[in-house]
Amino acid sequence: MRRFHGNRPKTQYHAAYALSPLRRLVAGEAVTVKLRVTNTGTAAWNNAGPCAAVLGDHWYQGRTRLVSETEVAPLPAPVSPGQTVELAASISVPDRPGTYTLAWDMRAQCEWFTKPGDVLRSQRVEVVYTR
């Protein structure tokens, strides 16, 4: 997926995330994570069309090795600047045990909100074979 580059101001598409910590998950399982996402940018997020806004996840091993990135939760309705929406993200845990970083990001206009060098809202997750 592309990151926003070029002429779009950084503040046009921006988000804040609130969620409970995920510390330990089972390798290969599907998990639903509930989180609140606030539109802290200046543009409304559209929930319809080919480039509608969606919540995505990025799984990293170490600090920079991207394992996967997936769109995990569509918006139930358009989200105006300043508005908060509650989402249920369906995530797929990596198949191999280890320590991962799970980062959250929104996508709109067919591009991720974050730019290279931005800090994503992330959490460290231990992936194990069994609980």
Where are these regions (language model features)?
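Low-complexity, acidic Ser/Thr/Pro/Gly-rich terminal tails and inter-domain linkers that flank the onset
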Residues: 2-26
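Short, surface-exposed loop/turn segments at beta-strand-coil junctions that are enriched for proline
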Residues: 90-98
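Short beta-strand elements of extracellular/lumenal beta-sandwich folds
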Residues: 27-43
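Short acidic, flexible loop segments centered on an aromatic residue
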Residues: 40-66, 105-107
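Short, surface-exposed ligand- or partner-binding patches at beta-edge/loop junctions that are enriched
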Residues: 98-108
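Beta-sandwich strand segments
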Residues: 45-46, 110-121
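Short proline/glycine- and polar residue-rich coil/turn motifs
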Residues: 74-85
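Short beta-strand and strand-turn-strand segments in soluble, beta-rich domains
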Residues: 14-17, 58-75
